[in-house]
């Protein structure tokens, strides 16, 4: 059984400890197959349980995201406030492209065979209603490091801060207990990166490579990754997202990369991070890491509550007219306790809150 937030809504299984294995699937839905795709949303939890039941100790889970164009085709209701196609970031030197994507499946487990089997079953159930436009098999790399050798996710929020950073509150513009996710596939020029001295690599990140200790602010370069990924309000309040990046690669092709995936209650936080990285802050002061990293894909998805996936039409009907404005916004913020049960799209017991994922920091864009 699943325990809902105090607002009565059950979120998808976004927060959890870093998994050793993951499969990222981005699909497009064939024109005319919208009804099939919508009907399948309620079946996803059952498929996850069927695959994961045979190995509950390996914590199989799946997060489902819906793209803006598919939302318009599937539902008569307006899009959630933050849902729109991924915004291309075209800087003077580097570009973050916007690429097709109607559905996202973020599959995680302790074993790749479980991830693979779930991916196979999900796509098989959808049949010719969908096409796979991107598939990445990710793995955890040496003490939580990325392929470039630096620890990834050090600044991720934890516990209640993670919940508040990720899930939309009751009484806001979005359905409660939902979130937004942005995904990008980056490939790295490892030969050029490894030709740098460790000192130059550390300057690009703003962090020591071996110890993972952050540089003092006065020692960080203005184009360092940490500087450009710190998002603050005018009053100095820092805004964070939760990311679960994974390494991928092929020795045969020589392609090595990082799959970026970032969850946020306010997607503009992640978008401001990307604008800083690619356009620069100020313009032209782009992220030094991009001289060695190329964004190949870019997608933005709405991740509704599990209640919505189980009955989207019912949830949308219940929201008209919405009495959400009369609710206490704080009621959607719930601490994830160690004893919380898994949500329906997870085949295992939940992870302790102090193992929850977190992220680097970001500055909120004025809207």
Curated annotation (Swiss-Prot):
| Practical applications | Can be used as a bionanoreactor following immobilization on a glass surface.
| Spans annotated as Disordered | 311-367
Catalytic center residues:
152 (proton acceptor)
Where would you find this protein in the cell?
Answer: Encapsulin nanocompartment
The superkingdom of the source organism is Bacteria
- What is this enzyme's EC? 1.11.1.-
Entry keyword Oxidoreductase: yes
The record, for InterPro entries, names: Dimeric_a/b-barrel, Dyp_perox_C, Dyp_perox_N, Dyp_peroxidase
Q: What class of enzyme is it?
A: oxidoreductase
Alphabetic keyword roster: Encapsulin nanocompartment, Heme, Iron, Metal-binding, Oxidoreductase, Peroxidase
Q: Where does heme bind?
A: 225
Tell me which cofactor or cofactors this protein depends on.
Answer: heme b
Tell me the protein family, please: Belongs to the DyP-type peroxidase family.
Outline what the protein does: Cargo protein of a type 1 encapsulin nanocompartment. Has both general peroxidase activity and dye-decolorizing activity. Can catalyze the oxidation of both protoporphyrinogen IX and coproporphyrinogen III to their corresponding porphyrins. Also efficiently decolorizes the dyes alizarin red and Cibacron blue F3GA. This cargo-loaded encapsulin nanocompartment is probably involved in protection against oxidative damage.
> Mind telling me what this protein is named?
Dye-decolorizing peroxidase
